[in-house]
Swiss-Prot record:
Any one cellular-component term (Gene Ontology): tRNA methyltransferase complex
Protein known as: tRNA (guanine-N(7)-)-methyltransferase
InterPro entries: SAM-dependent_MTases_sf, tRNA_(Gua-N-7)_MeTrfase_Trmb, tRNA_methyltr_TrmB_bact
Binding site for S-adenosyl-L-methionine: E43, E68, D95, D117
NCBIfam families according to UniProt: PRK00121.2-2, tRNA (guanosine(46)-N7)-methyltransferase TrmB
Family: Belongs to the class I-like SAM-binding methyltransferase superfamily. TrmB family.
Record carries keyword S-adenosyl-L-methionine: yes
EC number in record: 2.1.1.33
Database matches in CDD domains: AdoMet_MTases (cd02440)
Role: Catalyzes the formation of N(7)-methylguanine at position 46 (m7G46) in tRNA.
Any one GO molecular function term: tRNA (guanine(46)-N7)-methyltransferase activity
Signal peptide start-end: none
Organism per entry: Staphylococcus aureus (strain JH9)
Biological pathway: tRNA modification; N(7)-methylguanine-tRNA biosynthesis
Length: 214
């Protein structure tokens, strides 16, 4: 999805307590941003925030982090957090490659990857969020019981991700090849997912863990 640049977005994001600043040492201290010490779940690439804000509202016993690098859409997540009065959701405006700057080893319980950019050209494979470089980061910050939830409408990215995770030493606890046909009612739609599922697009989903987190 191409994001339209909004020159005012950067100023808008300044001085909001819901936004984790990009300065200083955060690894191991992320719980200090929340009112309560609770398990931490992250969504990488939150878009406009429908998925993560819905989760946070439904699960006040979990602390959520929305990680989105595009300032021009982060403000939409911020507005939702403020409007809904969510105290268990904070926002990081940065790239996923910087994950270990924010989280120490074993600090996270779950990672969500929803409709990530497929980067279809082979020369761009290293940018895919299921490339081995990113998997190594996830393994580092997830605790021993932690898992990864992945959802996409792109069959090629799904097949690539299954292979990439298997080669990295992960195993799958759930695989859905047509999520909306198999859904038990627990699925939370993203904005993107709603748009394309209404057009009949098949949605693929998996849950995976590392054989050895450390």
């Amino acid at each position: 999805m191409r994001v339209r640049y909004k020159p005012w977005a950067e100023d808008y994001l300044k001085d909001h307590p819901e936004l984790v600043d990009m300065e200083g040492q955060h690894a191991g201290k992320m719980t200090e941003w929340f009112d309560k010490t609770q398990p931490i779940h992250i969504e990488i690439g939150s878009g406009m925030g429908q998925f993560i804000t819905t989760l946070a509202a439904q699960n006040p016993h979990i602390n959520y982090i929305s990680m989105e690098r595009e300032k021009s859409i982060v403000y939409k997540v911020l507005d939702k957090v403020k409007e809904m009065g969510l105290t268990n959701l904070k926002i990081i405006c940065n790239d996923a490659i910087e994950l270990n700057e924010y989280f120490k080893d074993g600090e996270v319980s779950r990672i969500y990857l929803n409709f990530s950019d497929p980067w279809p050209k082979n020369r761009h494979a290293k940018r895919r969020l299921t490339y081995h470089t990113f998997l190594a980061l996830y393994q580092q910050i997830l605790n021993d019981e932690g898992d990864l939830h992945f959802k996409t409408d792109n069959r090629g990215l799904f097949a690539y991700s299954l292979e990439s995770m298997s080669q990295f030493g992960m195993y799958f606890t759930k695989i859905n090849l047509n999520l909306h046909q198999e859904d038990d009612g627990s699925n939370i739609l993203t904005e993107y997912e709603k748009k394309f599922s209404d057009k009949g697009s098949r949605i693929y989903r998996m849950e995976a863990k590392f054989h050895s987190q450390k």
